[in-house]
Structure formats: C-alpha cells, structure tokens
C-alpha cells in the first residue's frame, strides 16, 4: 500500500517538473493557441456549432455576422479589435517630422536644370530618395507613381512639388478615412446620419471660420451640413453613405477649407458649409415662417426666392415630400433648397423629376408637361402678360432634350441632354420661364453693358 502511494507521488512530481521546463514555442505560436482556445471555449459557452457541414473546414469564410445586442462580449471584442486596427493604420502614416524629412531629401536630390521655378528630380534620384526615406515611404516610390506624374519634361523628370503634393494628399486621405472610420459604429464602411452628425459636431471647434457661431446654432449648422452629404450621396434614401463616397466627392474639401483663417468673402459665400451660407439658409427659413411655429405651410413656402414658383408645383412638393400635418420641417426644407439651387446636378434633377412625374411612370409625357405649364400660363395672365402657346414650348422642350422615345422624357434623358435645369425652370417657375423666353434680349443687354465698360476704360 505504502509502495503504491510512493509511486503515485513520484509520478505527480515528475509531471510537475516536466511542466516547469521552459516552453520552446514562439510568441506567435502561443498567441495562436490562445486564440484557438478562446474560440473553442466561447463556442462551447454559446452552445456549440450544431450540424456543421464538413465543407466549412475547406471553404473560406466570407460573411461575418454583426453581433446582436445581447452579445455584449462579441460587441466589446469587435470594438476593441477595430480600435487597435485603426491605431495601427494611423501609426503607419507619415507624421509632420517625417514629411519635413522627405521634403529635405527631395530638395537635396533635385536634378538641374529647373523648369521655370520648379525643382525637378530624375527617376534614378527618385529611387535613391526612396531608399533613404524609410519604410513608411516605400509605397510612394514606385514606377507607377513616377509615371503618373511624368509629363512633358525633355529629360524624363518629374516635379518635386507635384510629387510632394501627391504624398501629402494621400496621407490626408488616409488620415481622414481613419478619422471617419472612428465614427462608423457598425464597422461596415459607411456612416449613418447620426454618425456623420457626431463627426461634424466634433469638427466644428477645429474650423476657425466657424468660431463666430453661437453654440445654440450648432444643431442647425450640423443639420444643414449633413443634409448636403445625404442629398447628393444617398439618392436612394438608404440612411447611410459609404466612407469611400465621402472621400471621393469634394464636400469634405469644402468643409475642411474652413480651416483657412484668411478665406475670402467670395469663397465663403459660395461654400455651403460656411457660416454665412448656413446662416443665410436658416435665416430664409425663419423669414418664411410667418406664424413662428417652426414649420412651413404651403402658403409660407410660396414666398420662397422670387415668389414665382407655381402653386401646382408646390402642391406636388407637399404631396411627395415628408411633412407633418401638412407642414414642412427644416430638414425637408434643406432638401428643397439643395434641389432648386443645384438644378444642373443629377441628384437635384431626380428630386424635381419625381415631383413632375405625377403618375410615377418613370417618364414625362405631353400631358405632364401641359399640366405644369398651364400654371405658368395662368401666372402670366395675372401679371398682364400674353400667355405663350404650349405647343411651341412643348416642341422646344423636346428639341432641347432629344429623348430616345420622341413621346417620353425620362430622367436619364434630362441628365444626358444637359438641359435639365432649363426644362425644370420652364415648368415650375415663372421667373425661370421668363428668363428662358427673353434669353436673347438678356444676352444682348450683357454684351452692350460689357462694351460700354470697355469704352469707359
């Protein structure tokens, strides 16, 4: 009996000593085992993978389900892993010191002669700089990048300034993508309206041109800014925009232009995101809201702009757009303004076309054109003008658009023709129709005034 107990203890001691021997595995192997064990125990805790097919072991996984609300552990794991990933990507970017060092190296390796005031660099020197600049710069020093920037230099060189601006632009794009991705709660590569609102709200203090805005106006400013992104980048009203689309359009450039403390007055007035522009749009809304209930009735909206939008068109606005007890809120008003102020843009034409296409047929026929133009004729009578024949106007519209089907005008026809803004103005706005009808007189007046200015000089 005693011998059995002694043998048992000897066996336990041998096992203990064996476990104390140094582990010969690498850190990567240990982490791999840790990850494997975590997956195994987590799967067991969730109830296991019942009825899993053998093919799952051979087919790569291509769909990753988002964790449900009750899967707190998976949500936390996903958030942490995304944060670590974005931090790593951020560290891979060139910082200011590294960019300055790159500029110094490029300047040191410039190859004469200069072209005008621009310093140039040859491909051989370009590769030398790439070797000295460090690993972070490797992706910029490729034959493809050099060929992109190669123009008509007789010595086969590229401009140092153009190359450096290319690097700066790439770094900025990656920084901005990482910054936007931090607000991508779902981690799917797109931003919802609330995500973009948070991004712009936190961006406001970094934009000197917005220093004069009262904090009480921030919510209206954010709404004004966000609506432009969603009006043009989310035409199907999915409620989300791809981060790639945000980076590809010029809106973010316009927004970040407000970092310039010396931005000209003209630039501010033409920039939708500037303080003067946002205050102008909001001020117009308040001026239209005569009963001060925070909403616009059809009668109040009829005074928009020059007050010459037809009642038939306004009826369609209130039928087709989201309203509350027959009145329009600020967000819906912003869509209306963006459509009318950007009538050349496809998204704006889509908005107006939807209102003109009363029967949702996907095209405008002679009946639809006549329905809207009759309101223009009625307004002309009210103002003591001789009504223009619809047949003449109809023929002019079809001549301008040149639709594929000679009896139907589709949205694509309007976009392709480049005359969508003119056609929509003729049908919905008396002032727009008058401008079109008297275009030759207006051009002649402009020519005369320009000639007079030249004579004065």
From Swiss-Prot:
Compartment(s): Nucleus; Cytoplasm
Pfam family, one: EF-hand_13
GO molecular function: metal ion binding
Gene3D superfamilies assigned: 1.10.238.220, EF-hand (1.10.238.10)
Gene Ontology biological-process annotations: B cell homeostasis; cortical cytoskeleton organization; microtubule cytoskeleton organization; positive regulation of B cell differentiation; regulation of dephosphorylation; T cell homeostasis
Membrane-spanning intervals of the chain: none
SUPFAM superfamilies, per the entry: EF-hand
Keyword Nucleus in annotation: yes
Binding positions (Ca(2+)): 289, 291, 293, 295, 300
Stretches assigned to the EF-hand domain: 276-311, 344-379
UniProt cross-references to InterPro entries, sorted A to Z: EF-hand-dom_pair, EF-hand_13, EF_Hand_1_Ca_BS, PPP2R3C
Segment forming the signal sequence: none
GO cellular component: centrosome; cytoplasm; nucleus
Keywords, in A-Z order: Calcium, Cytoplasm, Metal-binding, Nucleus, Repeat
Source organism superkingdom: Eukaryota
Protein purpose: Possible role in the regulation of cell death.
Name of protein: Serine/threonine-protein phosphatase 2A regulatory subunit B'' subunit gamma
Annotated source species: Danio rerio
């Amino acid at each position: 009996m005693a011998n059995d107990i002694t043998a048992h203890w000897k066996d336990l001691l041998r096992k203990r000593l064996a476990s104390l021997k140094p582990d010969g595995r690498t850190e990567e192997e240990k982490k791999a085992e840790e990850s494997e064990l975590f997956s195994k125990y987590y799967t067991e805790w969730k109830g296991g993978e019942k009825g899993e097919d053998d093919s799952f072991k051979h087919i790569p996984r291509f769909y990753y389900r988002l964790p449900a609300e009750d899967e707190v552990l998976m949500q936390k794991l996903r958030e942490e892993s995304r944060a670590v990933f974005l931090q790593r990507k951020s560290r891979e970017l060139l910082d200011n010191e590294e960019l300055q060092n790159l500029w110094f190296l490029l300047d040191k390796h410039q190859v004469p002669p200069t072209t005008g005031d621009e310093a140039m660099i040859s491909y051989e020197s370009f590769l030398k700089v790439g070797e000295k600049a460090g690993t972070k710069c490797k992706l910029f020093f490729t034959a493809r990048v050099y060929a992109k920037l190669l123009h008509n230099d007789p010595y086969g060189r590229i401009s140092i300034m153009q190359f450096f601006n290319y690097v700066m632009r790439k770094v900025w794009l990656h920084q901005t993508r990482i910054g936007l991705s931090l607000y991508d709660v779902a981690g799917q590569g797109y931003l919802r309206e609330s995500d973009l609102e948070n991004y712009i709200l936190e961006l406001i203090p970094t934009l000197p041109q917005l220093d004069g805005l009262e904090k009480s106006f921030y919510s209206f400013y954010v709404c004004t800014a966000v609506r432009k992104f969603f009006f043009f980048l989310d035409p199907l009203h999915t409620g989300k925009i791809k981060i790639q689309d945000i980076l590809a359009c010029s809106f973010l450039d316009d927004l970040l232009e407000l970092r310039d403390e010396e931005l000209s007055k003209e630039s501010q007035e033409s920039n939708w995101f500037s303080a003067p522009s946002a205050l102008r749009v909001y001020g117009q809304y308040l001026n239209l809201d005569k009963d001060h209930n925070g909403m616009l009735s059809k009668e109040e909206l009829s005074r928009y702009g020059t007050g010459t939008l037809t009642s038939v068109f306004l009826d369609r606005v209130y039928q087709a757009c989201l309203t509350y007890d027959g009145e329009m809120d600020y967000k819906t008003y912003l869509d209306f303004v963006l459509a009318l102020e950007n009538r050349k843009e496809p998204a704006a034409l889509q908005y107006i076309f939807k209102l003109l296409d009363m029967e949702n047929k996907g095209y405008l026929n002679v009946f639809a054109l006549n329905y809207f133009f009759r309101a223009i004729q009625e307004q002309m009578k009210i103002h003591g003008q001789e009504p223009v024949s619809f047949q003449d106007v109809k023929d002019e519209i079809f001549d301008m658009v040149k639709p594929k089907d000679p009896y139907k005008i589709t949205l694509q026809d309007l976009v392709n023709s480049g005359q969508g803004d003119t056609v929509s103005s003729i049908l919905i706005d008396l002032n727009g129709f008058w401008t079109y009808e008297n275009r030759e007189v207006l051009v002649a007046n402009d020519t005369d005034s320009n000639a007079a200015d030249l004579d004065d000089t």
